[in-house]
Amino acid sequence: MTTPLTLENISQAPKALLHDHLDGGLRPSTVLELAGQYGYDDLPADDVDELATFFRTAAHSGSLVRYLEPFAHTVGVMQTAEALHRVAFECVEDLAGDNVVYAEVRFAPELHIEGGMGLDAVVDAVLAGFADGEKAAASAGRTITVRCLVTAMRHAARSREIAELAIRFRDRGVVGFDIAGAEAGYPPTRHLDAFEYMRGNNARFTIHAGEAFGLPSIHEAIAFCGADRLGHGVRIVDDITVAPDGQVKLGRLAAILRDKRIPLELCPSSNVQTGAVASIAEHPFDLLARTRFRVTVNTDNRLMSDTSMSQEMLRLVEAFGYGWSDLARFTINAMKSSFIPFDERLALIDDVIKPRYAVLAG
């Protein structure tokens, strides 16, 4: 018998997560405790519930710029090795609790050196937190693999340095590189040197593109930068037309994105909150899925968006009527698109994801 698609049941399904920001996923209680421990005095509230409400309200601003402002507070309490280790450990713990079996969690090392740490020490602390979190999850009966993407800020000028950091740590848990931050005025082509360095070292990278800015950002990310994946990429819908009879026509950019199987790291709730789309029901996720783009489901920022992978999946189920086979396909899409070796991807798909979804589907 098919298992009902409730939040409780969806939480039991295995999940693969490609787009999750470490500094966007802290527990409100941890933000408060770290602020007190390290003397960070700029928090807008000193109560856990009030602080959670602050982050949630800011997320629902309808603006990417406003959505990003509260990160000053999470980054502000992540300036020591101990704090970074704790946040990374709890990230793994929370994801494992939601039955995420594979995750690539990204963060920008350059934002965590205000306390005097070097970039290498920052990455060391995060990777140690991930490793210890994996061990603790396994001891609790929840196996999870977490890998890291190091991110450069697109408005800054350290992208080549961060790309070199990715290569230095490529055998220790860093599987790729990313650029993030406000898109408008900061095109991905400002960082060609970093992307060329990654390609020259046979390394993988994703680019935040097509979230708050339109098709030119996606075009540059694909045509000039050579992105392996797109962070968000939701504005590709601007290159797709749907006729009154339902026939879908792809523009040249949309067609190459689909035909090359370039994965889209879609983050439905975040896209609504930043104003990229009006509602989950109006999100182009379903159009892209039906048109056979390689779509994946992601959280973006679990604290700011007050979300989880299970909640993101449930919202899509409620909006578009998806079944277990659809959720399995989106999960397999993500696993296929991950930056770990092929045999590791295949093992998780064949040994974990497919069997567990088969049980849920009945």
Swiss-Prot record:
- EC number(s) on file: 3.5.4.4
Question: Care to name a GO molecular-function term for this sequence?
Answer: adenosine deaminase activity
Which controlled-vocabulary keywords does the entry list?
Answer: Hydrolase, Metal-binding, Nucleotide metabolism, Zinc
Q: Which InterPro entries match?
A: A_deaminase (IPR028893), A_deaminase_dom (IPR001365), Ado/ade_deaminase (IPR006330), Metal_Hydrolase (IPR032466)
Q: Active site located where? A: E211 (proton donor)
Q: Which residues bind substrate?
A: H21, D23, G181
Q: What does the entry's cofactor note say about binding and number?
A: Binds 1 zinc ion per subunit.
Annotated function: Catalyzes the hydrolytic deamination of adenosine and 2-deoxyadenosine.
Q: Which HAMAP family match?
A: A_deaminase
The protein depicted here goes by the name Adenosine deaminase
Organism of origin: Mycobacterium sp. (strain KMS)
Q: What is the lineage of its organism?
A: Bacteria, Bacillati, Actinomycetota, Actinomycetes, Mycobacteriales
Q: Which gene encodes it?
A: add
